[in-house]
Structure formats: structure tokens, C-alpha cells
From Swiss-Prot:
InterPro entries given in the database record: Ald_DH/histidinol_DH, Ald_DH_C, Ald_DH_N, Aldehyde_DH_dom, G-glutamylP_reductase_CS, Glu-5-SA_DH, GPR_dom
Subcellular location: Cytoplasm
Catalytic activity reported: L-glutamate 5-semialdehyde + phosphate + NADP(+) = L-glutamyl 5-phosphate + NADPH + H(+)
A Pfam family it matches: Aldedh
Major localisation: cytoplasm
Cited function: Catalyzes the NADPH-dependent reduction of L-glutamate 5-phosphate into L-glutamate 5-semialdehyde and phosphate. The product spontaneously undergoes cyclization to form 1-pyrroline-5-carboxylate.
Identification of the protein by name: Gamma-glutamyl phosphate reductase
Record flagged with keyword Cytoplasm: yes
GO molecular function: glutamate-5-semialdehyde dehydrogenase activity; NADP binding
GO terms under cellular component: cytoplasm
């Protein structure tokens, strides 16, 4: 790192802030036209993107990165198509910018409304997630924000090529390429400098492991929206349909392990523990899932690791799960309160009152009843491609789509009133 590099960070941040002023007043039709062209260009550039991704994968394998990281890093024609479709979904969503709502008319005749406006410049700091480059670029563009992207070294080549494709479309439409900016050097010192650019950047959204989130939160001078780890639980209630509960368990744990909405914990009411866990032992073994369990649950599994209380709450991101038998509903809630990460929690039950109590009581950004944790995703919830899942409650909570990338300002209209 040198002074020239530091100057580059400030220049890129300033250029993004300047570009954001242009985008803030762009009409929805123009935005949608640009986004559709971005989707087309991603498809047309599939071979180039895959070649860059292969460079990242080769380096990752040489560095012995884990299977979860490799899965997040991997791009395929199908995943690139999903990125393009995600952008097209964003096109179909209403533009939140400029939407107003009436609040009141005061006794003195002034009228008060609120209008949605862009945040300004959003900075994304993320690890081995090349899809974030396209998702964040498109979401920020539609919501009127410039975005500065600082990806990890693991996905650098993929991110640079994806950004180049999107920037080319911007320039074709006579828009500044600084609307989607990628920091070309993953040096950690440059990331520190980026987090000091509060004169130009309005919010930072980190996506990655626990270490990255804590580092950004501790060192940023810019407000941070945390997207923390996903320690998601399935609670099998005493009134659960056990076949449905099994489907939720297998889908949540085995469909795709290296994502934040995968199940990491299974909590089972003692009244159904024998019936459910006896079958779960067979099903999980067939999927080669490693079992970690409390002493009460361990007897149902061969070769499992017995956990004490301090060892729950891990984000495995692999074919591995922690299992606990609880005495009752309150015991389940206590476990989630102690070991959950405010991401996604699931209950399997046929009891409507219990389901409602679970949704009202559990402190998580998404609370599912009889539905897989894997639906905790912006696309699945109808938001289009998400910028992440916020686990801190300030400004946004849960999957962040277009509206979450805006704020509201007051509009006050009068006829010459003055305050006495």
C-alpha cells in the first residue's frame, strides 16, 4: 500500500458520490432499459466470466480453501443465468424512489408527506461471492444508489470481469461507470482506507464470515448494516407433522450447505424425540451428515460428537448439524435466544397458537412456520436479487431488496406560514 493507492481509494469514492447525483433523478423506464441490457450482456459474456472464475477457483484450490468457500466462489452457466434472471426480476419490481405517502395536515395548514430517496453511495465489502457484484450492482442501480464493491481476493478476477460487463452497459447508455465501482486491489490496508471515506460513502454492508463482519463493524467510520452469520434452527414441536418436519430438515440441511440460510441446528421437543430422531438418524446418515448432539439426543446416533452447552451456535456451512432435545416450547426459545444469530428460525407444528407464539417470540429477521429455511432469500420472498440479509435492526432487518436501499425524507408544503 502507498500514498498513490490511498489517493485512488478517495478518488473512486468521490467519483461514485458524484455519479450518484446523476442516478438519483433517473426515470424508472431508463433504469429498466439499462438493467435489461445488463442481463443480456451477462449472458453474452458467460464464457469470459467462467474463464475468470476458473482463475479464482484454481487459486482457491491451491490455497486449500474449504468446500463452503469453494461453493460460494463457483460460477456455472446456470448460476450466471440465475444472476441475469435476478436482474430481470428487479426490472419487474416497482421503483421505490420518489414514492410519496401523505402523513397529515397541521392546524395551521401546512401539509406533510414523506418521499423515498436513495441512500446515496453504498459500499459492499464481501468475500468469495462473485454473484454479489451483479446483484448489488443491479439493486443499487434500480434504487438510485451508486455502489462501491470491495470483494475478497478469492473472487477478484470474477468480480472484475462482471463489473466490466456492467460498466460497459452503463457507458453505452451515456451513464458514468463510477455508478458501479470495483476496488481492483484486495489489500486490507486499502479496505481500511475505504472504511474512512465518510465524506463520500453513506453506508457499508459487509457480507462474509464472522471475522469480516466484526472487523468492519469495529473499524468503520461509516454506518454499518450487519449481515451476520446464519445459525438457523428448525424446532420440531410436539404437535408437528413429523413427515413434514423431516422434509424441512433435509431440505434445510442438505440441499446446499455453504449458504447462510442452511440449517445449522435441530431442536426437538422431548415428546416426539424418539419418533423423529430415530428416523432422522437414518435419513441424515444417508446424506453423510456429521452429527453433533446433546447427551439426550446422542443415543439416537452412531458415532456422533456429544456437545456441552458452550459448543452450540456454530455455523458449519457443511454437511454437519447440532441437535438438541428440549423439555418444552420455552426451552426451545431459550436455546434459540442463546445460540441463534437473528437470521432465520423455523418451527414445524400443526398448532396455530404455537406457531403464532413462535413468530411473535423468536428474535430473528425471518421466522418460518412449516416452510424451509432455504426460502429466506430475497428472490424467494419476491424481492428480486437481495443485497444481503440484515441481522441488525437499525434501518433494515432481514432480506434487503430495493426498498431497504432507500430512506424517507419529509416534504412540507405551505402557503407562507411562519412560526409564532
Amino acid at each position: 500500500m502507498n500514498n498513490q493507492s490511498l489517493s485512488l481509494i478517495e478518488t473512486l469514492s468521490r467519483d461514485a458520490a458524484t455519479a450518484a447525483q446523476t442516478l438519483a433523478v433517473l426515470d424508472e423506464q431508463t433504469k429498466n432499459t439499462v438493467l435489461l441490457d445488463m442481463a443480456k450482456s451477462l449472458r453474452a459474456s458467460t464464457a469470459e466470466i467462467l474463464a475468470a472464475n476458473q482463475q479464482d477457483l484454481t487459486r482457491a484450490e491451491e490455497d486449500n480453501l474449504g468446500s463452503a468457500m469453494l461453493d460460494r466462489l463457483l460460477l456455472t452457466p446456470e448460476r450466471i443465468e440465475a444472476m441475469a434472471q435476478g436482474i430481470e426480476t428487479i426490472v419487474s419490481l416497482p421503483d421505490p424512489v420518489g414514492i410519496t405517502r401523505d402523513l397529515s395536515e397541521r392546524p395551521n395548514g401546512i401539509k406533510i408527506r414523506k418521499m423515498r430517496i436513495p441512500l446515496g453511495v453504498v459500499c459492499m465489502i464481501y468475500e468469495a461471492r462473485p454473484n454479489v457484484t451483479a446483484d448489488a450492482g443491479a439493486l443499487c442501480f434500480k434504487s438510485g444508489n451508486a455502489v462501491v464493491l470491495r470483494g475478497g481476493k478469492e473472487a477478484l478476477q470474477s468480480s472484475l470481469v462482471i463489473a466490466k460487463v456492467l460498466q460497459a452497459v452503463l457507458q453505452q447508455h451515456k451513464l458514468p461507470k463510477a455508478l458501479i465501482t470495483v476496488i481492483p486491489d484486495p489489500d486490507r490496508g486499502l479496505m481500511m482506507e475505504l472504511m474512512q471515506q465518510r465524506a463520500y460513502i453513506d453506508v457499508i454492508i459487509p457480507r462474509g464470515g464472522e471475522g469480516l463482519i466484526n472487523f468492519v463493524t469495529d473499524n468503520s467510520k461509516i454506518p454499518v448494516i450487519q449481515h451476520f452469520k446464519g445459525v438457523c434452527h428448525l424446532y420440531v414441536d410436539k404437535d408437528a407433522d413429523l413427515d413434514n418436519a423431516m422434509a424441512l430438515l433435509l431440505n434445510g440441511k442438505t440441499q446446499r450447505t455453504g449458504v447462510c440460510n442452511a440449517l445449522e441446528g435441530l431442536i426437538v421437543h422431548q415428546d416426539v424425540a424418539e419418533a423423529f430422531l430415530s428416523k432422522a438418524a437414518v435419513e441424515l446418515a444417508s446424506h453423510k451428515v456429521k452429527i453433533n448432539a446433546c447427551s439426550r439426543a446422542a443415543k439416537y446416533f452412531t458415532g456422533c460428537t456429544v456437545l456441552d452447552d458452550s459448543e452450540f451456535g456454530q455455523e458449519y456451512l457443511d454437511l454437519e448439524i447440532a441437535i438438541r432435545i428440549v423439555d418444552d416450547f420455552d426451552h426451545a426459545i431459550d436455546h434459540i435466544r442463546a445460540f441463534g444469530s437473528h437470521h432465520t428460525e423455523v418451527i414445524s407444528t400443526k398448532n396455530d397458537a404455537t406457531a403464532m407464539r413462535f413468530q411473535r417470540t423468536v428474535d430473528a429477521s425471518v421466522v418460518m412456520v412449516n416452510a424451509s429455511s432455504r426460502f429466506s432469500d430475497g428472490g424467494e420472498l419476491g424481492l428480486g436479487a437481495e443485497i444481503g440479509i440484515a441481522t441488525s435492526k437499525l434501518h433494515a432487518y432481514g432480506p434487503m431488496g430495493l426498498e431497504s436501499l432507500t430512506a424517507e425524507k419529509y416534504l412540507v408544503n405551505g402557503t407562507g406560514q411562519v412560526r409564532s
